[in-house]
Amino acid sequence: MLQNEVENFTNLLEQATVYLAPYQEKIIVVKYGGNAMINEDLKKLVMQDILLLNQLGVKVVLVHGGGPEISQGVKLLGKEPQFINGLRVTDQDTINVVLQMLAGKVNKSLVALLKGKGVGLCGIDANMLQCEKLQAEVDYGFVGEIVKVNTQLLELALSANLIPVISTVGVDDQGVAYNINADTVASEIAMALGAAKLVSMTDIAGLLRDRFDESTLIPEVEVSEVQGLIDQGIIAGGMIPKIACCTDFINAGGIEANIIDGRVPHAILVSLFGGKNGTLFYKK
């Protein structure tokens, strides 16, 4: 490495250390999904960024979805994926696909990209995600809601400087497996671990005043403003439960939560290093 390259690298490292100081030896939970997971180039960049954070002393927990792969697996069975109010209807065939694709193929492909630092976990392991069947007006099948998060495996992995990579399947007290919403899992795990920050990667720029115009991005929201934004119709549809996960985390003692644009290369680093990406939720 040439002298000027060494100097540039040193300067960058010093700047990164300043921005990361509040998070060193602290836990950040990242919910990973959307286009950043489908696009192979973006996927590699995300894993590289998470590895870098790990090397710089940040304890990262990665919670991932896998919707497209699950839908593809269901179609291979000759069935059409079904959704109601944004939630996947999960019959017996579908939960089998979830276990094979989400907890299997998708999880292990991410672990492989973490080059020996990732450890693949499923919410069924050691009853990490204890859940019960989701009670709703509609019967979603094997869709669960979390009753308790057991953090023992996560704490063991983090203490060994490993990166837990978690697929969002839980189990009830009868040993029945359930599919669980990834944003909910990330928020519940962040609260259970006392994480400093929750990051949710999406396929949109963040919270928009006009959902058809990305120039109307709202960069910051104080949690007390959320209900007013719902009343105005600015927070609507699938953003309501996503933002509820952020506010639940902050109200439980988390420092801040970000909904970031996963289509942007190095989106996680940009948000941590003080750049403009997505919407930051915080409490005064």
Swiss-Prot record:
Organism of this sequence: Actinobacillus pleuropneumoniae serotype 3 (strain JL03)
EC number(s) on file: 2.7.2.8
Enzyme class, spelled out: transferase
Annotated GO MF terms: acetylglutamate kinase activity; ATP binding
Name under which the protein is recorded: Acetylglutamate kinase
Reactions catalysed: N-acetyl-L-glutamate + ATP = N-acetyl-L-glutamyl 5-phosphate + ADP
This protein's pathway: Amino-acid biosynthesis; L-arginine biosynthesis; N(2)-acetyl-L-ornithine from L-glutamate: step 2/4
Keywords: Amino-acid biosynthesis, Arginine biosynthesis, ATP-binding, Cytoplasm, Kinase, Nucleotide-binding, Transferase
NCBIfam families: argB
Superkingdom to which the source organism belongs: Bacteria
Gene3D superfamilies listed in its UniProt record: Acetylglutamate kinase-like (3.40.1160.10)
Family, per entry: Belongs to the acetylglutamate kinase family. ArgB subfamily.
Chief location bin: cytoplasm
Cited InterPro entries: AceGlu_kinase-like_sf, AcgluKinase_fam, ArgB, Asp/Glu/Uridylate_kinase, Glu/AcGlu_kinase, NAGK-C
Lineage: Bacteria, Pseudomonadati, Pseudomonadota, Gammaproteobacteria, Pasteurellales
Protein localization: Cytoplasm
SUPFAM superfamilies in UniProt: Carbamate kinase-like (SSF53633)
Residues marked Transition state stabilizer (site): 31, 242
Residues noted as binding substrate in the record, renumbered to the chain: 66-67, 88, 179
